Amino acid sequence: MDYIADGDFAKKTSQGIVLVDFYATWCMPCLRMEKQVEEFASSNSNVSVYKYDVDRGVQTWNEVKKKHNVRSIPFVVIYKDGEPVAAEVGYKSSEELQKILDNIS
């Protein structure tokens, strides 16, 4: 699974279906969800999946929240051709992620 940052965010989310997992290394639900996101990615080769570490870039948490409409973490957003089409807060299993994807397809 690849990482995404603001420098390449628009490019990587501009085509097709893309799931972005906003997380932090200190967030226990985020760490528990990592395996679920990996399982989802392995069973959905048509979806690009990226992780966005909210502490990794130069922006503050408040800037990340504002720019990407992140309400809390873990936070998952599905983009279709550059536009957000689904967003979910909290721990999600791979099955729940699949249901979210199925609802937008």
Regions picked out by a protein language model, each given a short descriptive name:
Residues 1-11:
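N-terminal "domain-start" segment that seeds a small globular fold
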Residues 9, 22-23, 79:
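Conserved hydrophobic/aromatic "anchor" residues
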Residues 13-25:
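Short active-site neighborhood of thiol/selenol oxidoreductases, capturing the structured segment around
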Residues 24-27, 82:
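Receiver (REC) domain active-site loop signature in two-component systems and cognate sites
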Residues 27-30, 76:
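The canonical Cys-X-X-Cys-His
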Residues 29-43:
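Typically the conserved alpha-helix immediately C-terminal to a functionally engaged Cys/Sec
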Residues 42, 46-105:
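Thioredoxin-like thiol-disulfide oxidoreductase module
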